[in-house]
Curated annotation (Swiss-Prot):
Gene this chain is encoded by: ruvC
Active site: D21, E81, H154
Ligand binding (Mg(2+) 2): E81
Enzyme Commission number: 3.1.21.10
Entry protein name: Crossover junction endodeoxyribonuclease RuvC
Compartments in which it is found: Cytoplasm
Any one cellular-component term (Gene Ontology): Holliday junction resolvase complex
Taxon lineage: Bacteria, Pseudomonadati, Spirochaetota, Spirochaetia, Spirochaetales
Organism from which the protein derives: Treponema denticola (strain ATCC 35405 / DSM 14222 / CIP 103919 / JCM 8153 / KCTC 15104)
Length: 178
């Protein structure tokens, strides 16, 4: 469990963006950089929490792991999907709580957050606001020059949020170094 590393964990020496796809069971994350008109994937994965833990313990684990990523990579910018209300109110509440602790960790780390609607992320990554999940995953793979689609799905979604932060020009320091 914990952080699943699916890409390089080398120390980042240039400005980067963290993308987060919050969820109580699995919170996806992705760290990318952008320079010389080229994206680079630094690390991605998922923070998993066990269902037998108390709600507060699960939220603390998410907070601690996101804080560790911020400490390790020192991102100045973050992209996160806005919460959309699903039919399942319990699920929406859990995602909202996870999102809250992620936003707290980002605020404590001095990370500037851009929040994007799902269709905005799809459009920024694929050019199509109504793109299917698989199209977004393929676009993330292509944009970041990865050999395969990032797994788990939450990590791919987080990388898409980070790409959106850059593609929409909603970054300060990252673009300043381009």
């Amino acid at each position: 469990m914990g952080i699943l590393k699916a890409a390089s964990s080398k120390k980042n020496l240039r400005p980067c963006v963290i993308g987060i796809d919050p969820g109580l069971a699995n919170t996806g994350y992705g760290i990318i950089s952008f320079s010389n008109n080229r994206f680079e994937c630094i690390e991605y994965g998922s923070i998993s929490t066990e269902p037998h833990l108390l709600q507060g313990e699960r939220l603390l684990k998410i907070f601690d792991k996101v804080s560790e990523l911020i400490e390790k990579y020192r991102p100045k910018e973050a992209g996160i999907e806005t919460l959309y209300f699903a039919k399942n109110a319990t699920s929406a509440m859990s995602v909202s709580e996870a999102r809250g602790v992620v936003l707290l960790a980002l605020a404590q780390g001095g990370v500037r957050v851009g929040e994007y609607a799902p269709n905005s992320i799809k459009k920024a990554v694929t050019g199509i606001a109504q793109a299917e999940k698989r199209q977004v995953q393929e676009a993330v793979k292509l944009i970041l020059g990865l050999k395969e689609i990032p797994r788990p799905d939450h990590a791919a979604d987080a990388l898409a949020a980070a790409i959106t932060k850059i593609n929409l020009g909603d970054v300060g320091e990252v673009r300043a170094y381009v």
